[in-house]
Amino acid sequence: SFEDFYARIERSSSPAEVYEVLRSAHGFGNFLAYQVLVDLLYPLKVYGNVPLLPYSHNDWASPGPGALRGIKMLLQENMDVEPLEVMCWLHRHQREEFQRLDLDFPFLADENDRVQDISLANIQNCLCEFHKYIKISEGTGRGRRKFTASKPVLFAVR
């Protein structure tokens, strides 16, 4: 039942455990389970502006295939390091790396105008997008879909 499934999620002691519970659900693969986990970590207005789970987007991430390829592009060949370790390093050192590279990164701010670092979950996404960007820019691959503009929708004005 859904109640039993959700109870397993509530009993989980880490985001990685929640991910495994989600993956165990019929129809949930690695990608969907991770995306649902990430969504469950956002604060909900109907839940008092707190997330359903007691974890943050910086506690754990599951690198998908694109992120793994992005990490491989960043590292020297045959470096024996766990992908999550690389993502955590990027998260911890992002500000000093932007400074070292003389990049004026446009960090987002929270509701109190405090600058927010790029979360571990978003670093995972960035690594995937980095991989796609490099393969397209170097002509070694293409995007999944070709962009075609849709026809404008015309609304009747009364």
Model-derived regions, located:
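Helix-hairpin-helix/helix-loop-helix acidic hairpins
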Residues: 1-26
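Generic structural signal of hydrophobic/aromatic residues within well-ordered alpha-helices
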Residues: 5-9, 18, 71, 86-90, ...
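A general structural-boundary detector
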Residues: 23, 53-54, 117
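Phosphate-backbone recognition surface of nucleic-acid-processing proteins
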Residues: 37-103, 109
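Low-complexity, acidic/Ser/Thr- and charged residue-rich accessory regions of DNA metabolism proteins
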Residues: 98-158
